[in-house]
Amino acid sequence: MLYEMKPLGCEPAKLTGLSEKLIFSHYENNYGGAVKRLNAITATLAELDMATAPVFTLNGLKREELIATNSMILHEVYFDSLGDGGSLDGALKTAIERDFGSVERWQAEFTAMGKALGGGSGWVLLTYSPRDGRLVNQWASDHAHTLAGGTPVLALDMYEHSYHMDYGAKAAAYVDAFMQNIHWQRAATRFAAAVRD
């Protein structure tokens, strides 16, 4: 299977506090790099003779495949989460209020988690857990750690490549800018699909 980059779903010039240069660099270099890396790993695995390949080679490739796959998927959720998508309402708002007590409580926790990752790396994810039938805020230290069985509804990339060009070490300002640019309709669509499945 050959993976392809999904088109950028937002208009970078219309985002508040995030430059076009930052968004295009992040999209092309980091997301695009993950897609290219996954295609290369997939091709290598397809050619690997499983009967004779050293187990450490297979293990290394499978680990890198997981990292590249999650990087690709999380970047797709991240970029799809950006834009002018109206306000939070409907079933997603109701679920956030049910699972966090209020939208303000959810936002305070999600934002604080992002700011705590400043200068580090990882993701902050609003994830639907089908096991528990609820939304959870999740910290993922890298591309290989996400909630098993969970579906990311909203993704905040906290690797330095996502903000350093615009904000330097001021990760907290980047988190605030991200929160102003959430495309709630797309997040609601992901939530509805996760609940249906």
Curated annotation (Swiss-Prot):
Where Fe cation binds, per the record, is at: 26, 75, 157, 161
Molecular function as annotated in GO = metal ion binding; superoxide dismutase activity
**Keyword terms, alphabetized:** Chromate resistance, Iron, Metal-binding, Oxidoreductase, Plasmid
Lineage top rank: taxon: Bacteria
- What is the protein's quaternary organization? Homotetramer.
Miscellaneous: This protein is not essential for chromate resistance, however it may contribute to resistance under certain environmental conditions.
Any idea what job this protein has?
Answer: Destroys superoxide anion radicals which are normally produced within the cells and which are toxic to biological systems.
PANTHER family the UniProt entry points to:
SUPEROXIDE DISMUTASE 2 (PTHR11404), SUPEROXIDE DISMUTASE [MN], MITOCHONDRIAL (PTHR11404:SF6)
Report what the protein is called: Superoxide dismutase [Fe]
Q: Which organism is it from?
A: Cupriavidus metallidurans (strain ATCC 43123 / DSM 2839 / NBRC 102507 / CH34) (Ralstonia metallidurans)
